[in-house]
Amino acid sequence: MHQDYRELSLDELESVEKQTLRTIVQALQQYSKEAKSIFETTAADSSGEVIVLAEDITQYALEVAETYPINRRFAGFIDYKRVRWLPSPHGLLPQVLLVDAKASTEKNRDTLQRSQLPMDAEFRNTSSGEVVTMEAGVIPHLMLQSANDGVLPAVTTSIFVHFYYRELKDVEGRYRELKSIYVLSLPHARLKQRYNPDPDTSFFGAGKHSPARGEVARIRVYFDRLKEACPWRLQELHYSADSEYTQPRWRDLNDAGHEVTKEFLFLER
């Protein structure tokens, strides 16, 4: 049984990321009723304040979803950061779980700063044909000193939670409608050759920033391209009219390699 993620095969590393994502999706599903109430009935003066609201809700959802913690801190520009032990079929692995919350009236992309990027990215600019690159800002692992003279790398796992909503006007007590919660798992740096081997095989695109104004460079992740590369890496928890909770659906691949969605059971918080 492994403790060093670098000893895992790429398939095993993918399964660790998939297991982590599945836990996050379960936690968000179980909190989705309260999340909708908080998100829709809390006043916010700007889109930036709505994002802060999404960050708080994500924290609330995940506070009961933790595994055995490791008493270390991870410094970084991510909303939710936890160093912990992760039980897996491949061993008990130290992990740095990184979860960042977004909120937008768009449902097709997320914008990341370099400090949130887990793997070196490259893509071809659709208008100019120029190849654009951005180095990863998230380290692949955090080295931990053991009590018995060993060193363990805690693998970083990057998850993004995207709150998709629309603004409401003249609706008493409600300021916006939360329509879906998207949950993305971006691949670890070791998986770059699987997901972004060249500029033309990429789910990345140009981010919105102004070099002339000295703004920090950003990069976009496109949902449809990520789902095409690996269906389970993009999950959607959708609110329907007949339930206070989101629909508990998990996207995956079947044995024939076709995309399927399956309903899962969940508990009330």
Curated annotation (Swiss-Prot):
The keyword Nuclease applies. InterPro entries: Restrct_endonuc_II_SfiI (IPR021580), Restrct_endonuc_II_SfiI_dom1 (IPR043118), Restrct_endonuc_II_SfiI_dom2 (IPR043117). Its EC number is 3.1.21.4. It catalyses: Endonucleolytic cleavage of DNA to give specific double-stranded fragments with terminal 5'-phosphates. Gene3D superfamilies: 3.40.600.40, Type II restriction enzyme SfiI, DNA-recognition domain. GO terms for biological process: DNA restriction-modification system. GO terms for molecular function: type II site-specific deoxyribonuclease activity. It comes from Streptomyces fimbriatus. This is Type II restriction enzyme SfiI. It is an enzyme of class 3 (hydrolase).
